[in-house]
Amino acid sequence: LKAIFNEYGANIPVTDKMRKKLLTLGVHLRDDTHFISIPERPFLRAGYDAYEGSLAKLMQSLVGQALAGTITPERALERAAKELKKHIQSHIEKGSFVPNSELTQKLKGGNHPLIDEKKLMDTLEYEVHMK
């Protein structure tokens, strides 16, 4: 869910339960605050776009190898997916994203958007399915 909220942004309705939780953390929301807005931080789309050229070259090479029979199509796709994952993780670490709000900085203890305990980066996975 965090990944989707960050990729596309979100307006999260503030519930009474959320207000109480934030109060325990020392954060008081104004009575007229009805949503918490998370800005768009497109790490997947922007990560792909940033490395599209090098990924296209890799894919050309892998397709050639698969056609020559030196690598299976499954292995070619596996290598391409692994490379894309590596580039997206790198983009998350280096990316220039909308800064965290003061509240988020206080809760996380830092201001590196998309990274707190590296859970998002560490949970990026891929699957190769052949039909």
Predicted regions and their residues:
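Short, Lys/Arg-rich flexible segments
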Residues: 1-131
